[in-house]
Amino acid sequence: MVLVAIHDTKKSARPAWLRAPAPVGENYRELKSIMDGMKLHTVCESAACPNVGDCWNRRTATFMILGNVCTRRCGFCAVQKGAPLAVDYDEPRRLAEAAAAMGLRYAVVTSVNRDDRKDGGAELFAMTIHAIRERIPACRVEVLVPDFQGSREALEIVM
């Protein structure tokens, strides 16, 4: 008797609505150059978002402050985990410059978790909001803050 393994050698194709084209286009290249040149991070790149090409071609991005290394190890997240670098206090100024270069009227800012900092990074959120408002007064700012480990004081710093 001969045993034959039976399995489908064809990989099931993802549905069209789930596939995203490789990031290309003039706006994508320009935003990539801005982010790289100003040493900024986006959740788009750090979390390996498949829609980065689409969003960046529409000149939208979610900035990620406080570095690109998270102090938590959430299994669902693609952001790098480990011991983060020191806080870069020039990051808010560079982010505001990037937002101006992108012509933003609405900026979205989030961050990695920084459980290594007493305020969880609240001070840098406040500095970033201030820098954007100072550089682009008409720009609205949305911040997606971490939980600050439940610290009301940290939240008040941001507000």
Positions of PLM-derived features:
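Flexible, acidic/Gly-rich N-terminal and inter-domain linker regions that tether
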Residues: M1-R72
